[in-house]
């Protein structure tokens, strides 16, 4: 079992806004986008380790996080990018979460429905925010894969051989 620490800072931010009485759907949406940007800014090392495990391990790997949609969603998008999947397919795959994810928000049922929707589902703008951060920090996804995640041509070929069917 591998643990890759990626701390979800969004929870503390949401609680702070709630305590100030300022938690609205637009605020929640922006906090979610900022959380995704921070995956790139502060957690590239953890995502690099994920790819290390994908390349080294022989057993199947399960990738998950608390809700199974945000950190896992970004990790899955990175894996698909590394495998050469077209961006529009990656975006469609990410948004399938909203169709198949059964969220349990009973612990935060006192929040307005639009805020619950913002934090309990995925939004294309969340993934866009992460890849905008990739663009700002690395120029493009290919450079992020190569320089940030240390996936050169040999590693990408090995991933494709291991995880794609002919």
Can you describe what each PLM-predicted range is?
Residues 1-62, 74-166:
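Cys-dependent protein tyrosine phosphatase-like superfamily
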Residues 67, 71-72:
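Ser/Thr-glycine-rich phosphate-binding loops at phosphate-binding pockets of nucleotides
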